[in-house]
A protein has these predicted regions:
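Non-catalytic terminal regions of proteins
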Residues: 1-49
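Post-HExxH zinc-binding segment in Zn-dependent metallohydrolases
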Residues: 101-130
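Catalytic Zn2+-binding segment of zinc metalloproteases
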Residues: 86-103
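Short alpha-helical catalytic segment bearing the HExxH-like zincin motif
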Residues: 77-86
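Active-site scaffold of zinc-dependent metalloenzymes
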Residues: 34-76, 89-93
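Intrinsic-disorder/low-complexity, polar/charged segments
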Residues: 22-28, 73-78, 97
């Protein structure tokens, strides 16, 4: 397994983390996370055609819940894919805290914040290995 830089972001007001990484093999990060229910390692199957992926996870080291957002390459980090994956992550966070995305403003602010996290990784402003 190759070492992949995981960029961790903390929304502070929510008990949930966002991890963003760029790797051409999503399984490179599987050893660092458990499935959301904590019952086993995450596994990525049939990801050859995926350009990006988001899933709810639990971090193995500190048992923090969050969403991992993975991109195959910087080329795949276009505005469409960033928005798409940020939307998945925002929905997962709202599901985790029992909030309704129909309460528009909090959801939209969160979506924008997650997109900004991804943009930060794309622009290499933050590289924190977790």
């Amino acid at each position: 397994m190759r070492e992949v830089v995981l960029n961790r972001f903390d929304p502070v007001i929510y008990p949930y983390k966002i991890w963003v990484a760029i790797t051409d093999n999503f399984n490179d990060v599987s050893g660092r996370f458990l499935s959301y229910d904590g019952k086993g390692d995450i596994k990525f199957l049939d990801t050859d055609k995926c350009h990006a992926m988001t899933m709810a996870v639990m971090h193995k080291e500190d048992y923090k819940y969050g969403a991992i957002i993975l991109f195959k390459s910087k080329k795949e980090m276009n505005i469409g894919n960033i928005t798409h994956e940020a939307s998945h992550a925002a929905k997962l966070l709202f599901e985790h805290i029992g909030a309704d995305p129909a309460e528009h403003e909090p959801f939209e602010y969160l979506l924008g914040w997650i997109a900004e996290c991804i943009w930060t990784v794309l622009k290499e402003k933050k590289q924190k290995n977790e």
